[in-house]
């Protein structure tokens, strides 16, 4: 598996300048090795192509974006450099996947969240620890941290070997709807960014966490193309609004697949 991953990643590196895909951190810096113990990397299993990020919320469950789903996935937990393996890095496959289908009033983008149950639990270690669900809703103006192995150029064609991190701000709904007029007023999404531009999540950051005031508040969803445009904050699935559903599924209430 490791040899396949190395060969596949070398091919991806050669092709990355010709590829364009889903979402990356613009204007950030390499994350500190110790600040992303919950960050998960999702790969397409057959080709071992890097797809998205995700967030470990306990020893056997990962939260990511629904649009990151593929027929066959492989997840790396405790990874930093794509080409340098930590001793405690762990790989897992999904055993179950769940999608939010609880309301016809929500758009597909509102429902852009997926729960993945790992085929076996992971162990906490130097580079692995889960991130709890939020205990309170986020506040407009909060300083938030977004991270991922996504594109680091607005044109989306440069992918890093290591995750990048950057601070952005939570934007109010009025500013968000000016940028995205078709966004419903009742949308279960968050807007975050820097209104001057130049800093943003980007392609292949999708599915990764938005952490505001120390709490896991968002899942990278989608944004402008090119990334990091002025007055175009990115959109994030609002995790707090899905707390009940997530807890229901992870507690074993999988038949309803909806909050009680």
UniProtKB/Swiss-Prot annotation:
Molecular function per GO: serine-type endopeptidase activity; toxin activity
Gene3D superfamilies: Trypsin-like serine proteases
Record PTM text: N-glycosylated.
Glycan attachment residues as annotated in the record: 101, 105, 124, 253
Tissue expr: Expressed by the venom gland.
InterPro entries: Peptidase_S1_PA, Peptidase_S1_PA_chymotrypsin, Peptidase_S1A, Trypsin_dom, TRYPSIN_HIS
Known EC number: 3.4.21.-
Ribosomal protein found in the keyword field: no
Hydrolase found in the keyword field: yes
Stretch forming the signal peptide: 1-18
Main localization (coarse): secreted
Location of the Peptidase S1 domain: 25-251
GO biological process terms, semicolon-separated: proteolysis
Active-site residues, record numbering mapped to chain: 67, 112, 206
UniProt-listed Pfam families: Trypsin
Cystines in this chain: 31-165, 52-68, 102-258, 144-212, 176-191, 202-227
Location(s), subcellular: Secreted
GO CC terms in record: extracellular region; secretory granule
Propeptide part(s) removed at maturation, as residue ranges: 19-24
Subunit structure: Monomer.
Family: Belongs to the peptidase S1 family. Snake venom subfamily.
Biological function: Thrombin-like snake venom serine protease that coagulates human fibrinogen by hydrolysis of the alpha chains (FGA).
Note: Negative results: does not hydrolyze the beta chains of fibrinogen (FGB).
Protein name per the record: Thrombin-like enzyme acutobin
Species in which this protein is naturally found: Deinagkistrodon acutus
